[in-house]
Amino acid sequence: MSIETLELKSCIQCGRCSGGCPVSMKSSLNPRKLVYCYLNDLCQGMSADELGLWECTTCTTCTERCPKGVRPADLVVEMRSKVIESGRMTTQIRGALESTYLQGNPWGRGREKRMDWAEGLDLPILKPGGKTDVLLFVCCTNAYDPRCQPAARALVQLLRAAGVEFGVIGEEETCCSSEQRRIGEQGMFEELRDSNTKLIMERGPKRVVATSPHSFNAFKNDYPGLSVPVMHYTQLLAELLEAGKLKPKRQIEEVVTYHDPCYLGKQNMVFEEPRQALQALAGDRFVELDRSRETSLCCEGGGGRMWVDSAGKGRLAEVRVRDSIDLGATILATACPYCTLTLEDAVKTTDSEAKLRIKDIAELLAESL
């Protein structure tokens, strides 16, 4: 990227980016200063930690708030790429990248275990040359993390209940590389983008449904060769509910609220579909957080932050948990595996297990059938 591409010269140093940045108050990251520093060649000799590069969650709140179209989050990714090229990265980030290269996922798990989440489900494995309505892209976190696997299994239950023709890639499914790109590993992203595009297209799907907003965003916006419609799973569920193919049999009797994942909400404007599912389940017991939709507070899970220790006191996910409890909710729903993990951890670190449960929307809907 260039200064011109990022519209950096349009910056008027108004500070709206830093004022909206969810982590700037507790870390060295300051989007306004970073743009100024970059434009005036003042970043030379400063470390990534001094610049706060690893603190950015790439939530793009800074970009959304900029009145001149400057994209500070993209500048962070560009500057990170220089750090990655030099080899100056944390052990955690290096491990995630090496695991992606060797095993096709950033979690250090063997490729042969990628389908363990689906044990006993007898899922159709799509082969090259075949055809299907929906190719379900499970994503690395839902495939490997024990907390997120139930959400993937619940989604399978829902698709079957609705009579959807679908299949999965199986053990060959490989990381979408969305987070690797945001970390700054552009070369790895391009390689996986091309191989994943081929892997998906040769299986003949009419559409791709992603369980993760990060995979959804990558396929929709960063995979130009993917010539079939891409959906997040909540969009498909809303479609099935509206068509009457999914009919909840039991209403949720608890107060439910919803955390908008950044990569689903403010970056792709998918706000209504998740709420349609929750309103079908909870009716007027569904309540909105004060910071929701375009102004939703980031949980700190994106932009490679799953492999970076959080700086400063307190975590944004803990704020989200407290806000939910103050609202009177006993269930905080979301639609992203990273959000599920950060929020679940925040429930524990705030000693709120008896007050609040974190649930994926697919889990809630499957429980109602």
Model-inferred region functions:
Residues 8-16, 22-40, 50, 148-151, ...:
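Hydrophobic scaffolds flanking metal-cofactor catalytic centers in soluble metalloenzymes
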Residues 240-254, 300-306, 368:
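Short, surface-exposed amphipathic charged segments that create phosphate/polyanion-binding patches used
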Residues 242-278:
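C-terminal amphipathic alpha-helical segment
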Residues 1-3, 27-47, 272-282, 304-308, ...:
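Short, charged low-complexity linear segments at domain edges
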Residues 142-232, 263-280, 285-369:
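Cofactor-cradling patches in redox/metallo enzymes
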Residues 11-17, 21, 56-62, 66, ...:
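Short cysteine clusters
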Residues 5-8, 25, 35-211, 216-223:
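Iron-sulfur-cluster electron-transfer modules
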